[in-house]
């Protein structure tokens, strides 16, 4: 066993850990050890670097932890996929590259919780801007010199994108020119974490590339954190496995857990911090009985509403092996073409009922009919909407099953446990069908492939959801921030009752945000990095933002009325 000492030890080189490693080592007198269980982000591996290849990392275990849930009781007892990134970049190395920050009211809602007043939207917006370089330039909402490259969809891409946005507007919903700007609500172009050269903009590329050569940062890959070490109620270091060696590293200041919503509570529990009854089941000495560790687990569930496309404009030909070498060559040489996009270039957020204070349904539009992980491709030209509810009241948990750090934990999201879940998914299917019936899609829209136009009743739609809904890969909230009995960390990510230990990742969200989670996770890390460094917080923004204030969910009648059921 070998022993080393650093000021900070970061467990997990993902969306948050790479931010912290980069920001903390900007101070040359600070030493940081960054541990990552996976390997490097190989820049010549098209599976992680080509945006259009986003499905490939989910099909293996090189870059994916490939967790599975316990049988989900409300989803036909299916064991459901729970892919998380493994390697430098974490889940930003394998995600769908959709840059969505969430709704302003998500953060204003966080700030209504006691002790979280400094997490209001206008307090968070400066940190979103700090992290970002947007290709069309900065403004009150977007940054121009941050580590994360953000590309905005341009006119003239696949005609299905423009048609689907226009169909949403014809159905009576708003149009928005920026889902991360003044108004999230509505349909419009979607920002993506893609570089100007058409490469995935993971946090390994954006952040670590700035910091790799610093003498005060040591990055160790294939390093699996076993447990956090304590002296009384103070974290003093980490024991990790590196090859055949067990290594101990000591932290002079803090241990920073950035392992994500599944592995962060798993590491805490394995180290003796968590629900006492769970720890005693595995004969783990209890350092602190903290009941919220692993509880409050949340995710976004989504379904694919798929249609045949009457015109040959979908991405269906790109799925054929004989067309892929040309696509790959253009991407590799020029950074352009079909390979340079994740093809989630349009989407939207709507309220399905007037009394919803902010959007409860998200859309990703895709000009092909296929599962997110590349499976079940429809053998014809098609298109689809990924549709799901945003703030499910259902809550799950992550529970340790073994003291072995290689063993996966027990994961139960408890999807669709509440009546509101079912109402929102039925509403979403019916709203989507109405959108797809609008004149803008007449030249493209063929028959409905999924769920199938013959499924109309509540019971039929519920049966479809149970059998076909899937994760959107947004686990969060399992080490929530706050000050109630189930809170795990305070407003600066410090674990309650323990000195020298923080959790900084999507697990500390008190409530899941409206949209994808990569951008909010980066923001959280940027904000807490300033707290760790004892920097003055960035000046609060004075940007304006949209609040519905009871306005109708639709501004007008649909161009084409709903079909009679």
Curated annotation (Swiss-Prot):
Function of the molecule: Involved in the biosynthesis of the osmoprotectant glycine betaine. Catalyzes the oxidation of choline to betaine aldehyde and betaine aldehyde to glycine betaine at the same rate.
Catalytic activity entry: choline + A = betaine aldehyde + AH2; betaine aldehyde + NAD(+) + H2O = glycine betaine + NADH + 2 H(+)
Keyword Flavoprotein among record annotations: yes
GO cellular component: membrane
Pathway: Amine and polyamine biosynthesis; betaine biosynthesis via choline pathway; betaine aldehyde from choline (cytochrome c reductase route): step 1/1
Cofactor(s) needed for function: FAD
SUPFAM superfamilies linked: FAD-linked reductases, C-terminal domain, FAD/NAD(P)-binding domain
Protein's recorded name: Oxygen-dependent choline dehydrogenase
EC number: 1.1.99.1, 1.2.1.8
